[in-house]
Amino acid sequence: LVGSEMCIRDRHYIFPCEMSSLDELSGLPNIVYLDRGESYEDDRLRVNVFGSTDMGVSYLVTAEGKTIFHAGDLNNWHWRDESTEEEVREAETAYLSELYYMKRTIKSIDVAMFPVDARLGKDYMRGAEQFVGEFNVGMFVPMHFYPAVRKAEAFAPIAKRYGTEFVLLSRTGDSVII
């Protein structure tokens, strides 16, 4: 979490409403708490908040004509190898419902940061593929994959099939120009 010593006074911090009761954040300047369906806008950017299928929320940031989506824990989280068929269906339904909700607002995304988590077992890329299949995504950056770098790399041909550039940031300090 962001501690007061890390809080830069001329910046705004946007957190999910569920974090508003944390003692570590109380009294810090420039904090905005948002929930699914809410947004924040200033003279430089707009942040739309969407849901998650686990903890927190997901964010769509629009700035300088670019849209950047950070999925947080939004994903088709199911462990088919361990879950019942009903649990798999529930996870799939929750995830696809959130994508449907998002499609009412989002037409295209320049950069999407999205989980490709090999801990899910054989379906670990399913949510990511459903995501790039639903939205016109220019660049896909996987997250939640370390240390399974090769598993994350396996998504590159899927992204390409949807006309999406795949960028793997696998080491500390890696960056990409948008």
Predicted regions and their residues:
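Active-site-proximal segments of metal-dependent phosphoesterases and phosphodiesterases across multiple
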Residues: 85-91, 111-133
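Active-site neighborhood of phospho(di)ester-bond hydrolases with catalytic His/Asp-centered motifs
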Residues: 4, 13-19, 69-72, 89-91, ...
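Binuclear metal-ion centers of metallo-dependent hydrolases, dominated by the metallo-beta-lactamase
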Residues: 27-40, 120, 124-178
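Short, small-residue-biased leader/transition segments that mark boundaries at the very start
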Residues: 1-8
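Core dinuclear metal-dependent hydrolase active-site scaffold
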Residues: 30-108, 171-178
